[in-house]
Amino acid sequence: MFAFRCFVLALVLAGSAAALPSTADAALPRPAHVVIVVEENRSLAQVLDDPHAEYIHELIRDGALFTNAHGVTHPSLPNYLALFSGLTNDNQDGCPATGISNTAPNLATLLRAAHLSFAAYAEALPEEGWTGCAAGRYGRKHAPWVHFSNVPRTLSKPFSAFPKYTDLPTVSFVIPDIVDDMHDASIEVGDVWLKRNLKPLVAWGRANDTLLILTWDEGLDPDNTIATVFVGPMVKPGRYAERINHYTVLRTIEDMYGLPHAGHSADVAPIANAWR
């Protein structure tokens, strides 16, 4: 009888365990909005040590800083592609990108297939849907969605068309121009831009379930370290030492919304320990 009871208890416990979601699934929030902002060409130490990065340091204090975050390669374009599609290309910063299928699954196509929304806002983009390589302070190498024919051109918008916060898509990219993203200017210049454009959004987002992801494309040190910061009401502030990269961030967003995994995001785990 004792053995039978143990057997029944084991079956009950096994059934209960099978009904539970995985640790990662249970831990991930599903924000109303995610806004991803990508800066340029700074290592983690440069960002942390620069006294002029005052607003960035404020975001770090209020959010989750990943102290072991890395770009996946060099130079810019393959890192942007990795964050957007889980894939890289073979022609550096070439325009158009080669060595990558322009119909590969990506964050925009996955969201849209799940009846969720996506849009991208690039500062200095001449007009909605423009596909040229460069114009003034705009560079297509910093706009990965333009390299995919399965992303409607209407989703590629100038930053001047950034919507009212209540009209934000599920996931959006914000790309400053090549001065404001620190590519051709100092951290201080980028920090001023971020404060002017993000501070009101972050304040609104605290009450409206919005996650800000601030990251850099690549670092300038031998380990390709970058700063990556998550800020929002669902974030548990602190410093996190797990190793992450652009694939990890993509995987985290995919898992938040129950999406399939694009490219190499299938090879990594989501960020599961930085949430309230």
Label each region the model flagged:
Residues 25-276:
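Flexible, surface-exposed loop/gating regions in the mature catalytic domains
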Residues 16-28:
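C-terminal region of N-terminal signal peptides and the immediate post-cleavage residues
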Residues 1-5:
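Positively charged n-region of N-terminal signal peptides that target proteins for export
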